[in-house]
Amino acid sequence: FHFGDWLALDNPVQGAEQVMGATDEEFIANLYYAISAGIVAKAAGVLGYREEQEKYQKLSEEQFAVVQEEYYSATGRCCIKTQTALLLTLKYHLSKNEELTKRQLLKLFEQSNHKLKTGFVGTPLLNNVLTDNGMNDLAYELLLNEEFPGWLYEVKLGATTVWERWNSLLTDGTISGISMNSMNHYAYGSIQEWMFRHVAGINTMESHPGARTVQFAPTLNWDLRYAEAKYDSASGMYSIRWELSDKEHVTITMDVPFDCTAEAVLPMVAKSEKEAVAEVLGSEENGRYLLEPGHYEVSYQLSDWKEKTAVCVE
């Protein structure tokens, strides 16, 4: 992580060979030191190594405190004003004022005309953090953007793989003359995680290793209209599909493999439809339906469709 937010587009000194983003590399490196120590502590706990667990948990907490003291004001404002820094802040709950952080992040996106500027560190977090923090419409807007920089910009230029750089091909279709220019690079392909977890809505659950139980929790978007995904897990094939016939009705189909279960969290179910949905999926508990193995198809009317366009107030 000492390379920072590699290939981000927000460095004020831009040039054909610029590779470093504007997010402080020491902020990223120190933060991931804390995160890594926490992962080691968690693994040690699972394996029963209590002494090591306590050692690395203490290290993680101390390092998080160092990051917060160095890079955050007393009111919780992050002193690094980049998309990646604020995404990390929300992901790892570094600020005591997350509403302020969300407003800061939305302001940055307004200033960039709702275009991403993230690199190898920020992009894997980008859409997941936006959706998890009530900015799902912005996440979809970033996915569906056809201009540079964006995923569909690459598709429009004929890409069948994800590039290392957002501009590996120029707008006229010629290969950029920039050095270090891979045409098949995973980093920005990390958008697939968000597409599985939030668009289609298939989520593995840490409490159920081997995907013996998954969660179906799709998010709907009128600009996309439908989505479908399959997950060939160690326990069997899960699948889900949703399709909007109009802005008031959706049909969702779900398949749960033999000897497995799924937890379904359906979006925007109108109150008048809950009884009909329960006839297909069974009783609801805390907004969740427990599905046994089998095929399910449910159609229902949506609650009032409200575009959740956030208002930026500084």
Residues of each region from the PLM?
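The feature captures the catalytic groove of carbohydrate-active enzymes
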Residues: F1-E61, A65-N128
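Non-catalytic C-terminal accessory modules of carbohydrate-active enzymes
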Residues: K58, D137-E314
